[in-house]
């Protein structure tokens, strides 16, 4: 029955470089998780660097992970027995006041943006 369901963790957080998940997580029924991408409060360059590192890590078959940007990719990850990683951030500071940066982050795979957080930003 769980194999037919989608189990998604709504907020996984990595303070430093994201290095993957434990074997216990790999063995769980988790389908995907929203990952708060490290570097979100350090500006666009740091965030892009960390996103690249997450893609590189997920490219390793031993990671058991796949960055997912669409429902089709989520279904593909599930079919392959991988856990989907949905990239996002909790603090939109790195967008500054630029729709161009938001578009660039979307192209890099960011799919979740929390509009406000603990500190004031350009959005709220």
Question: Each PLM stretch: what is its role?
Answer:
Residues 1-124:
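N-terminal hydrophobic targeting/anchoring segments and the immediately downstream early-domain regions
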């Amino acid at each position: 029955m769980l194999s037919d369901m989608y189990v998604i963790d709504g907020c996984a957080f990595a303070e430093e470089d994201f290095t993957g998940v434990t074997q216990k997580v790999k063995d769980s029924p988790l389908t995907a998780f929203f990952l708060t991408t490290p570097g979100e409060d350090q500006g666009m360059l740091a965030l892009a660097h960390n996103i690249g590192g997450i893609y590189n890590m997920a490219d390793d078959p031993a990671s058991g992970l796949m960055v997912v940007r669409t429902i089709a990719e989520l279904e593909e990850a599930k079919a392959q027995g991988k856990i989907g990683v949905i990239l996002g951030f909790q603090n939109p500071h790195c967008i500054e006041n630029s729709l161009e940066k938001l578009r660039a982050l979307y192209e890099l795979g960011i799919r979740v943006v929390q509009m406000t957080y603990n500190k004031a930003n350009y959005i709220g």
